[in-house]
């Protein structure tokens, strides 16, 4: 596996993609959609081998389900590709244009970033997602999926490359690191001559590894330790519905709720209601001491570190706070900066909350589950960024672009 | 030097700055301006000690001049502070606001980044610049200047801190790493719990060190290997003026010209003119073989690596290219992505150039010297970014901010 020459080829492909118009890029995406349909049997059969190997390796049912790419799911993926075709291409937009006093006609033009390296786990549909969103925005990409789906991914990338070739675009626009050697991830992170951005889509360990070992800018994200604060003025019935939605709808995703902070003035009344509402849904309350004192054996006492965990299951941390200030201090200390919200009917407190809390998404009286590219109307989602530079929160097509300044003069020198 | 507690204090200060209004931030800047005036003697005297130590250490006259902060220069710095007061505060702006079909009122709000770490060299005015631009945008900062100006910098930061205290803002909003121990830079780069962005302002070695050792996003920049391509259709007289401006006006800065590419059809005629125009200004032409063959002993033959160097002096690389394509290939290989331009009267070629070249700033018939915050009308400049994420080219106040998504619902759950 010669990663350097793979990087060089990706960079060269990126130069061609950068000057490819929307029509041709969309033709490439349609060719990919058709090729995925035409190669359905090959893809599904490679996936079956992955599933079989996963079973032999003793993977859990939940993980095996994430690996699965059957006919139905593949049809869904193809339909997603066609949705991306319909989205506007952000590349080429000019903005902040002005004629300066010094005579320079200046503007910013939106351009592709170049080469995007994506390291991800498990789900093979990510392979198609990332390839398609990168191509739509004129970026080349280098993909590195998990070892559990390597057979599926290799076939998928072959199909994509053949489709690219059929429309006259470089096959090297989408490349896959076919070895499961972990050292290659470390090598990829050092290839700043060829790769412009790294997106790790995976657990906290992968995020940390990329942050600490990359010479290339890394979009850290997808780790959600999310909070809701039920203020004393909250409409308790509505709060129960929002908390249930945030916790139960899809507990394994990053915008699911980890911790509910409850104002002490309502804790005695609200916490038993909370338990009555959530217990039938399978939720276990993990309570700090004050909440535990109220809930008794309806809750498990929280251990050290519990309030820093992304649960990814039906556990819910519960903590009684003395006031707004204590709620803010808790969020500041424990939030991963993904999504945090307040449930309140007090206008002043609500405003204060959105002024003070600095997470990628801050909510008043809404579920944290809204932090999502499609919910936000972005049409697509590459990742959810929890860092502060370049992009925050759900990243759509625009976040796969950068800009360049264009200055036009009539033979202009600086005075 | 306990860098961890310094970082913690900066983070805490950043929370307060983030909710401080423009009026109070401007009052702090005016207090700083007044304090710099009131402490002029103390500052100038500390700077004299730095200059004396520099002389004893055998620093060059050019470097000693960069260290100098006398009464006149300090007055200039104070005047710059008052200019920043007059600029609009980007913090708090809301944009991309929309009411989504799912009922969520969504917008992005511009907010401070948090804590900015800046590592810089030589010039003590950078201490004031960075502190003032950070405060204006509600960011705390941790500064680490060069050892040559440590006495000046310590006094400047003391003056700033006293001014902050006088208006009731945390002194820890601006902190200085008072030790010259190089290991502390490495430690700062790992403090991702407290620092949100690193800006290295210095030579290529510092930039590389930060990129390779930081867990925190780094804004790489300020290294300019800049090109102009004189196409065959160029107005030669005007081209001479632009090339002279780009090379000679201020050869030690990053937007100065490194390399002139000349179309072979005009090389025989243009290169001797170029020499006649630039030689009296002290420029030495460093030519590749074809250009050397034309220029003879009017040029020095380029050595390996010369076309990758940022000259920072009156040398100018000169290369004859066969056509547009060869010019582009040279720029792709050797440009640092700072500023590159074409000199031409051919509309099609000009357009092709700005489409194909992906540098932070791309010019048609204008000097590379325009790549500058004040020339671009940004009012201020924190750094010139040559990387592609977050900000490209001159970074003004807005580039010291990020955004958060604000979602407001009437007790809204995700369907």
Swiss-Prot record, chains A, B:
One of its GO terms (biological process) is L-proline biosynthetic process. Coiled coil: none annotated. Transmembrane segments: none annotated. It is found in: Cytoplasm. Its EC number is 1.2.1.41. Keywords: Amino-acid biosynthesis, Cytoplasm, NADP, Oxidoreductase, Proline biosynthesis. Pfam families: Aldedh. PANTHER family: DELTA-1-PYRROLINE-5-CARBOXYLATE SYNTHASE (PTHR11063:SF8), GLUTAMATE SEMIALDEHYDE DEHYDROGENASE (PTHR11063). This is Gamma-glutamyl phosphate reductase. It comes from Psychromonas ingrahamii (strain DSM 17664 / CCUG 51855 / 37). The gene is proA.
